[in-house]
């Protein structure tokens, strides 16, 4: 596996003519819920305008692109690791596992897997070992990684909205489970439940009181 700091879709075309899957994650920092990843294989014959790092897009734009990606992609799949797996493995290894699940779930096998960040797990698809590279800030450079970041972000945000409906006293729709003051205040008042990551320091400290 190589790590690239600058790489574009045009560069990739010079060394891979097969299917390319982009992979990204969301939700490593929150105190609650799954870490969510996505793998996306885009169709070069059906380009999608406006793809970018999901964090740089408005919620409305992310939602619109989410629908377009789902419609036009050759294949996409969401992988995740649960709070229990995060507590057992640690957040890094759980994220790598979720990425592997996303790629393994693709309907088609990619020739190359490109991962946002500076590290990548080993990937297999139906017993075939895949070539993978990581690209620093790849979600703003590579269209398939941008698409994966959008799929993962929208998926997790919707899950936080659903959790907010079930537990409105925590304010998940606003902070999405991240460690904000409002979230800490809610935890102090209402405690934690089974979707919390009990190995994370703020949660662990509360449980040890």
Swiss-Prot record:
The keyword Membrane does not apply. GO terms for cellular component: cytoplasm; ribonuclease H2 complex. A divalent metal cation binds at residues 24-25, 116. It catalyses: Endonucleolytic cleavage to 5'-phosphomonoester. It is found in: Cytoplasm. Keywords: Cytoplasm, Endonuclease, Hydrolase, Manganese, Metal-binding, Nuclease. GO terms for molecular function: manganese ion binding; RNA binding; RNA-DNA hybrid ribonuclease activity. Its cofactor is Mn(2+); Mg(2+). The keyword Phosphoprotein does not apply. Its EC number is 3.1.26.4. GO terms for biological process: DNA replication, removal of RNA primer; mismatch repair. InterPro entries: RNase_HII, RNase_HII/HIII, RNase_HII/HIII_dom, RNaseH-like_sf, RNaseH_sf. Belongs to the RNase HII family. Endonuclease that specifically degrades the RNA of RNA-DNA hybrids. This is Ribonuclease HII. It comes from Shewanella sp. (strain ANA-3).
């Amino acid at each position: 596996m190589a790590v690239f700091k600058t790489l574009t879709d045009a560069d990739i075309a010079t060394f891979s003519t097969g299917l390319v899957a982009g992979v990204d994650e969301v939700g490593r920092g929150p105190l609650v819920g799954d870490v969510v990843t996505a793998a996306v294989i885009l169709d070069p014959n059906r380009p999608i305008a406006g793809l970018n790092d999901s964090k740089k897009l408005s919620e409305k734009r992310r939602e619109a692109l989410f629908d377009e990606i789902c419609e036009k992609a050759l294949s996409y799949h969401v992988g995740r690791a649960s709070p229990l797996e995060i507590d057992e493995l640690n957040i890094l290894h759980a994220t790598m596992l979720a990425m592997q699940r996303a790629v393994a779930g693709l309907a088609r096998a990619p020739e190359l897997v490109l991962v946002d960040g500076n590290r990548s797990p080993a990937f297999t698809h139906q017993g075939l070992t895949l070539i993978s590279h990581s690209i620093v800030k790849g979600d703003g450079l590579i269209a398939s990684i941008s698409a994966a970041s959008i799929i993962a972000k929208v998926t997790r945000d919707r899950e936080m909205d659903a959790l907010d409906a079930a537990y409105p006293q925590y304010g998940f729709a606003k902070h999405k489970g991240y460690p904000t003051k409002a979230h800490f205040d809610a935890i102090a008042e209402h405690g934690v439940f089974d979707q919390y990551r009990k190995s994370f320091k703020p949660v662990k400290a509360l449980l040890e009181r």
